Curated annotation (Swiss-Prot):
One GO molecular-function entry: gamma-glutamylcyclotransferase activity
Lineage: Eukaryota, Fungi, Dikarya, Ascomycota, Pezizomycotina
Entry protein name: Gamma-glutamyl cyclotransferase aclK
Pathway(s) it belongs to: Mycotoxin biosynthesis
Organism: Aspergillus oryzae (strain ATCC 42149 / RIB 40) (Yellow koji mold)
Reaction catalysed by this enzyme: an alpha-(gamma-L-glutamyl)-L-amino acid = 5-oxo-L-proline + an L-alpha-amino acid
């Protein structure tokens, strides 16, 4: 089983160059360069043996049920969905060459340690010209979700579109793109009047709550995320509590009355983290 490496200690030289592995929405040029406002010095398409893409990071029921994360191949988990098929391709991603200060900015923009933790992995460039320039192996920093749901909820069409557009732009193998599309069908919004009423009521309450928490998170990050990009522990605990509460209400109360907001069948979900 593959495992992550020991994370490097913070260095005062914020212009030091590091590789950052994007595998989800940051594959999209618009998300990474425009929304994150980060221009990398290089971009290399890589594979990461021993790891695979998941859509298991807890999102927002009825709107954005899940976001991307990664897991070890064959890692133990609460369901069989965490185990790979014999022919499944390993994780593909884009390694961006950025400064340490830009890496800290990414950590802060992805919630400042609330949902994701840092990991250091080894990746292999796909293209021969990249192998010749950068070597056969790269050490890459990335983020792994600490709030996962199994089986994996279905991602929104918007979010999956960002991943697929980024994968195509990075010239990922067609077989890998097909694998993503096959394994992760998109969430379909409620189709009946009853389900739409339930979704509207749920979103009407939780959207303002999550909006306020998002503003709090970004304000805490702008106020000074520190050397690691993390928000204060009190903010982290508050947001995680709200997320667990929201999904608890969805799983045990709301979905039994109005229908599920994650695209799965009744009784399917478990939130971990």
């Amino acid at each position: 089983m593959a495992s992550s490496l020991e994370l490097p200690k913070f260095e005062p030289d914020r212009d030091r160059l590091v590789w950052y592995l994007a595998y989800g929405s940051n594959l999209s040029s618009q998300t990474f360069r425009e929304d994150r406002q980060i221009t990398p010095q290089a971009a290399v398409t890589i594979t990461v043996p021993g790891w695979r893409l998941t859509l298991s990071s807890a999102g927002f029921p009825y709107r954005e049920p899940s976001f991307a994360s990664i897991v070890n191949v064959g890692s133990a988990g609460p369901t069989d969905e965490k185990h790979d098929g014999p022919c499944e391709l390993p994780l593909h991603g884009t390694a961006y060459l950025i400064t340490w200060s830009q890496w800290i900015k990414i950590v802060a923009s992805e919630g400042g340690g609330i949902v994701y933790k840092e990991a250091l992995l080894r990746g292999q460039p796909i293209q021969p010209q990249d192998q010749q320039r950068w070597g056969a192996e790269l050490s890459v920093l990335t983020l792994v979700s600490t709030m996962e749901r199994w089986p994996e909820p279905r991602p929104s069409q918007r979010y999956m579109g960002l991943i697929l557009d980024g994968a195509r732009a990075a010239d990922f193998p067609a077989s890998y793109i097909a694998q993503i599309r096959h394994k992760h069908p998109c969430y379909q919004p409620p189709s009946t009047t009853w389900e739409r009423i339930g979704a509207t009521l749920f979103l009407g309450f939780w959207t303002p709550v999550l909006t306020l928490l998002s503003l709090l998170t970004h304000a805490a990050a702008r106020a000074g995320p520190g050397d690691d990009g993390h928000v204060p522990e009190g903010v982290r605990a508050l947001v995680r509590f709200a997320m667990f509460t929201m999904w608890w209400v969805h799983d045990l109360i709301w979905s039994r009355i109005w229908g599920r907001g994650d695209g799965l069948f009744p009784g399917a979900m478990q939130l971990n983290g």
